[in-house]
From Swiss-Prot:
One of its GO terms (cellular component) is urease complex. Keywords: Cytoplasm, Hydrolase. The gene is ureB. It comes from Paenarthrobacter aurescens (strain TC1). Belongs to the urease beta subunit family. NCBIfam families: PRK13203.1 (NF009682), urease_beta (TIGR00192). Heterotrimer of UreA (gamma), UreB (beta) and UreC (alpha) subunits. Three heterotrimers associate to form the active enzyme. It catalyses: urea + 2 H2O + H(+) = hydrogencarbonate + 2 NH4(+). This is Urease subunit beta. GO terms for molecular function: urease activity.
Amino acid sequence: MIPGEYRLQPGSIACNSGRDAMVVEVVNRGDRPVQIGSHYHFAEANRALEFDREAAYGRRLDIPAGTAARFEPGDRKTVQLIELAGTREVHGLSNAVNGKLDGGTAVAGEPRPGIAAERDHQ
């Protein structure tokens, strides 16, 4: 072996295989690009992005760790989302959850606290 050398095994690696996935259409209605990282709670993404936030609750982009998706102004993209795993807790970000994703206080038919579909900025 040569110092620093690495050897790859034949075949491919499937990221996020077996995870429940859904597709959502996203439109950037803002005047600036928006970039969302791989593990960001998608429902809390920039309000300039128009999409079904309720459906995206508890989900992240189905892309490799450390990567991101970029939405230019006016862009319309379809992205795949998967459920957040682990302890399923979200803290910070846009402060919409700040705790466990499951067992929240949402009422049937009502948006979850902090996850409103309307844009709240100018």
